[in-house]
């Protein structure tokens, strides 16, 4: 009886081992693809292991995201909001906005998406080579503060038209998550997204 049980185990073990070897070899033979481009005024790199070409789908997702949250894109939703133009934010913008507001409340304003005027005054954002002095910074603080913006009927309401949003502290990570989602929908397990 013991010999029969051993043979049965062996019959199950052989296909299991062969299957595992096949899967490992196949994965090692799958090529890595790499693409790069520009988003948010910087470079992105995406490397992924997949038999097909996902470049068009990845670039489409980046383009959609850039059209929503890039302050470096004059036609993006966030740029239009900063220019006080009428815009209905898309789901990318709303997800980042809602999460930003949660974090702002949790940190008592230490995290704040209304910092664009301060970022620009230091030459970090869309306006380069400006070094705001302390008087300029103090005056800009009057038009910052997450509590000075709200969402009503799907639109951003600003208490002061000079308020500007900058979601880059969250947007780059969220864009990476969106691209990871694109890759995972295709069954890609090995990848790296860098922005």
Where does each model-flagged region fall?
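A contiguous, well-ordered beta/alpha segment that forms the leading edge of an enzyme domain
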Residues: 2-168, 181-192
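Short glycine/proline-centered loop/turn elements that form peptide/ligand docking sites
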Residues: 195
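Short, conserved phosphate/pyrophosphate- and ester-handling motifs at nucleotide-, phospho-/glycolipid
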Residues: 172
């Amino acid at each position: 009886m013991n010999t029969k049980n051993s043979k049965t185990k062996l019959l199950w073990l052989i296909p299991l081992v062969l299957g595992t070897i096949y899967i490992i070899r196949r994965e090692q033979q799958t090529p890595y693809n790499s693409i790069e481009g520009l988003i948010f005024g910087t470079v992105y790199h995406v490397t992924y292991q997949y038999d097909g070409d996902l470049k068009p789908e990845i670039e489409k997702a980046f383009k959609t995201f850039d059209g929503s949250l890039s302050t470096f894109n004059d036609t993006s939703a966030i740029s239009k909001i900063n220019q006080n133009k009428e815009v209905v934010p898309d789901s990318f913008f709303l997800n980042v906005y809602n999460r930003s507001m949660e974090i702002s409340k949790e940190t008592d304003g230490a995290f704040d998406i209304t910092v664009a005027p301060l970022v620009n005054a230091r030459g970090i954002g869309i306006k380069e080579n400006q070094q705001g002095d302390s008087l300029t910074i103090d005056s800009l603080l009057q038009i910052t503060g997450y509590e000075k913006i709200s969402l009503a009927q799907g639109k951003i309401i600003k208490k002061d038209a000079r308020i500007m949003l900058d979601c880059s502290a969250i947007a780059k990570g969220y864009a990476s998550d969106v691209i990871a989602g694109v890759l995972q929908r295709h069954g890609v397990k090995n990848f790296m997204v860098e922005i």
